[in-house]
């Protein structure tokens, strides 16, 4: 088990938390990051790109000139791909770029990302963070005190006040613990978890 300091919102140590080495202090595998982030970015692509081929371009039904005895190359339509205004040959079509990554690989990559933030001392665990009302300025002050200005804050989805407080901060975001992913961990400088969230991650990733 690895020991982690637990802080209050002013970064005063209030206790310690034992968490599984396999989840928070394991090996960092950068290749898993590549596989999972590549799949995430691929699934985010809209895939709506499309061009018109010769059957979709309007016009061109009439043969431009007779087949023989003109001295010119034979042509069947002014909408063939070699003509200006013609259809595109073998152009892009709408497609789905998403593909599945095995669940074991996704979990291993998430464990590796947590271990990376822990190794870099960019993982901050707070006892709890439950603002009474959404206050962006207050959230900015807390993150500054924690030394995590551009941070990903993770807690229960029900903590709407915290979500609204953090989402307006430049460079910081809030995620529900169920939606935590490698891509969002890596694109933020620091990771802030509540003690309950850390325990939930330990249980789900062990």
Curated annotation (Swiss-Prot):
Keywords, A to Z, come to: Ribonucleoprotein, Ribosomal protein, RNA-binding, rRNA-binding
Q: Which family does it belong to?
A: Belongs to the universal ribosomal protein uL4 family.
Instruction: List, as start-end ranges, the regions of compositional bias called Basic residues.
Output: 63-72
What does the record give as the function of this protein? One of the primary rRNA binding proteins, this protein initially binds near the 5'-end of the 23S rRNA. It is important during the early stages of 50S assembly. It makes multiple contacts with different domains of the 23S rRNA in the assembled 50S subunit and ribosome. Forms part of the polypeptide exit tunnel.
According to the record, the residues making up region (Disordered) are 48-97
A GO CC annotation given for this chain: ribosome
Q: Name one GO molecular function term.
A: structural constituent of ribosome
Name this polypeptide is given: Large ribosomal subunit protein uL4
Q: Name one GO biological process term.
A: translation
Q: Does the keyword Zinc belong to this entry?
A: no
């Amino acid at each position: 088990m690895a020991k982690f300091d637990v802080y209050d919102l002013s970064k005063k140590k209030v206790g310690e938390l034992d968490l599984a080495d396999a989840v928070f202090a394991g090996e960092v595998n950068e290749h898993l990051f590549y596989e999972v982030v590549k799949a995430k970015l691929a699934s985010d692509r809209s895939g709506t790109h499309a061009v018109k081929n010769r059957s979709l371009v309007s016009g061109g039904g009439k043969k431009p000139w007779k087949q023989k005895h003109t001295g010119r190359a034979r042509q069947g339509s002014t909408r063939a791909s070699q003509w200006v205004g013609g259809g595109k040959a073998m152009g892009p079509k709408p497609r789905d770029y998403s593909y599945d990554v095995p669940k074991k690989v996704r979990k291993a990559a998430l464990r590796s990302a947590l271990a990376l933030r822990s190794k870099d001392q960019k993982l901050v665990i707070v006892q709890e963070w439950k603002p009474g009302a959404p206050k962006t300025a207050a959230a900015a002050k807390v993150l500054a005190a924690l030394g995590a200005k551009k941070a990903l804050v993770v807690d229960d989805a029900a903590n709407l006040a915290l979500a609204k407080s953090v989402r307006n901060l430049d460079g910081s975001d809030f995620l529900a613990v169920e939606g935590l992913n490698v891509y969002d961990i890596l694109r933020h400088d620091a990771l802030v978890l509540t003690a309950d969230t850390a325990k939930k991650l330990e249980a789900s990733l062990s």
